A protein has these predicted regions:
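A well-structured
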Residues: 1-142
Length: 142
């Protein structure tokens, strides 16, 4: 069962990695070429992506596959992968999906406001959103 469990984990986390790549591409686009009017739509996209990623990392099968892996049957590289997957799963499982979505929403809003504030040299306009984002980050860390 260990080989099958590891193969399933590898496939699952490959998909999660692709979602991370998509998020980075969307972030890059937002930072370089996206017009201001696209911020709300991009925020919704990033929020959906964060929720989907969270669901994939925390689904019950992942916990079962992690438990079913036999470290003795794995290469050192695979063992390191399983340790990283387990850390990712445990962290994600301890954070509610609603908080993940709220973080994505707040991060998008804060970045949009920051870009405008930087251009206008008006930090005070972004301060409330930044405070909200920091509060959510603290909640995630708790």
């Amino acid at each position: 069962m260990s080989d099958d469990a590891y193969s399933r984990l590898e496939a699952q986390f490959t998909e999660i990695g692709r979602l991370d790549d998509i998020r980075r591409l969307l972030d890059w686009d937002r930072a370089t070429v996206m017009p201001d009017g696209g911020s709300d739509a991009r925020g919704a996209q990033l929020e959906t992506l964060a929720a989907l990623r969270h669901r994939l990392v925390t689904q019950p099968d992942v916990a079962r596959w992690l438990d079913d892996t036999d470290p003795g049957a794995l290469t050192p590289w695979e063992e390191a992968n399983v340790r990283a997957m387990r850390r990712m799963h445990l962290h994600a499982a301890s954070v509610p999906s609603a908080l993940i979505e709220a973080l994505a929403r707040a991060a998008n809003r804060t970045e949009h406001l920051w870009r405008r504030a930087r251009k206008d040299d008006d930090f005070s306009s972004v301060e409330p959103a930044l405070g909200e984002l920091l509060a959510l980050i603290r909640e995630e860390a708790a």
